[in-house]
């Protein structure tokens, strides 16, 4: 479905040109139109939080930790969730701020135990201005860093987010 969203359709790519008639093609991407309208409609108003217990401190904490996130975060998250059926949010700390990165299912994979708890999360990525593929593996204690051949390129870093849980959420 992601290919269709990007405009790579079978109808256009496998089109047989015929010289005895007009070959004008109308390429209207209704899937992209539908998803973009769904995202715009769902997120037209700012997301607000309320506490069932009436605890304003929790609401203030949520707003404090998410105020520096990208303005497009919620729309990108919903768009990828609609396209793939689910996606991931990876949480990390940078410059003493809680950050989040959206990971598409084409770039990451998780493994659950029989109770539905996430045990591992694998993420494949490229660094800026490099063609090499890197893999990070997250578990409850460490983050392991590998190259595309699963050769360790750095010592594991301590996973100190989420109190002993894998730092992802599945959306």
Regions found by a protein language model. Give the residues of each.
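Structured, contiguous alpha/beta core segments that scaffold functional sites
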Residues: 79-171
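Extended, helix-rich architectural segments
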Residues: 1-99
């Amino acid at each position: 479905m992601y290919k269709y969203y990007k405009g790579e359709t079978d109808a256009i790519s496998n089109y047989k040109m015929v010289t005895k008639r007009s070959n004008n093609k109308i390429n209207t991407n209704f899937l992209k139109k539908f998803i973009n309208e769904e995202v715009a409609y769902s997120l037209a108003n700012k997301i607000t939080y309320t506490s069932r217990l009436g605890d304003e401190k929790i609401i203030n904490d949520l707003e404090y930790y998410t105020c520096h996130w990208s303005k497009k975060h919620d729309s990108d998250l919903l768009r990828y969730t609609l396209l793939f059926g689910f996606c991931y949010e990876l949480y990390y700390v940078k410059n003493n701020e809680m950050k989040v990165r959206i990971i598409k299912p084409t770039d990451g994979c998780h493994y659950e135990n029989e109770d539905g708890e996430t045990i591992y999360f694998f993420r494949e990525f490229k660094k800026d201005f490099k063609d090499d593929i890197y893999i990070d593996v997250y578990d409850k204690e460490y983050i392991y860093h590998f190259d595309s051949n699963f050769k360790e390129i750095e010592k594991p870093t301590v996973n100190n987010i989420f109190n002993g849980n894998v730092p992802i959420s599945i959306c």
